[in-house]
Curated annotation (Swiss-Prot):
Its cofactor is Fe(2+). InterPro entries: Peptide_deformylase, Peptide_deformylase_sf. Removes the formyl group from the N-terminal Met of newly synthesized proteins. Requires at least a dipeptide for an efficient rate of reaction. N-terminal L-methionine is a prerequisite for activity but the enzyme has broad specificity at other positions. It comes from Thermotoga maritima (strain ATCC 43589 / DSM 3109 / JCM 10099 / NBRC 100826 / MSB8). The lineage of its organism: Bacteria, Thermotogati, Thermotogota, Thermotogae, Thermotogales. This is Peptide deformylase. Keywords: Hydrolase, Iron, Metal-binding, Protein biosynthesis. It holds the Pfam family Pep_deformylase. The gene is def. It comes from the Bacteria. Coiled coil: none annotated.
Length: 164
């Protein structure tokens, strides 16, 4: 199992590098990430959240775990919806985030094969949330400055726990 990196850890702000090796190490890392995600009752977990600055994440929106490697969002539906999101890197913080209802995506699986699919609703939301992590974008970047100010004390408390 991995330790979850929390707000204040610099790895969360880096743009992750593409995965180039589809080997046993990657598969083992993904298995550990899935175990970690389930342990913390998450529905998604991006590599930067466990200190790995590479472009992949795992998610499970009810159909079993999926590994998403080198993802791209090909199309974003202009229709959006607002819903509450939490994040394992922001313990006990939940915020309303506006995201596209439907997206078309392309990514690689653990064998390096390309997968293209359309996601909507909850699956689209989780994909967009984890995709943000690969670009160093966090949920607090998607809320208003006023809401961020209201969370300032909680955020500072979380940042104080970061192991330097």
């Amino acid at each position: 199992m991995y330790r979850i990196r929390v707000f204040g850890d610099p790895v969360l702000r880096k743009r992750a590098k593409p995965v180039t090796k589809f080997d046993e190490n990657l598969k083992k890392t993904i298995e550990r990430m899935i175990e970690t995600m389930y342990h913390y009752d998450g529905v998604g977990l991006a590599a930067p959240q466990v200190g790995i600055s590479q472009r992949f994440f795992v998610m499970d929106v009810g159909n079993g775990p999926v590994a998403v490697i080198n993802p791209e969002i090909l199309e974003i539906d202009p229709e959006t919806e607002v819903a509450e999101e939490g994040c394992l890197s922001f313990p006990e913080i939940f915020v309303e985030i506006e995201r596209s209802k439907r997206i078309k995506v392309k990514y690689q699986n653990t064998r390096g094969e390309y997968v293209e699919e359309e996601l909507e609703g909850y699956a689209a939301r989780v994909f967009q949330h984890e995709f943000d992590h690969l670009n160093g974008v966090l949920i607090i970047d998607r809320i208003s400055p006023a809401k961020r100010l209201l969370l300032r004390k909680k955020l500072m408390d979380i940042a104080r726990t970061v192991k330097r």
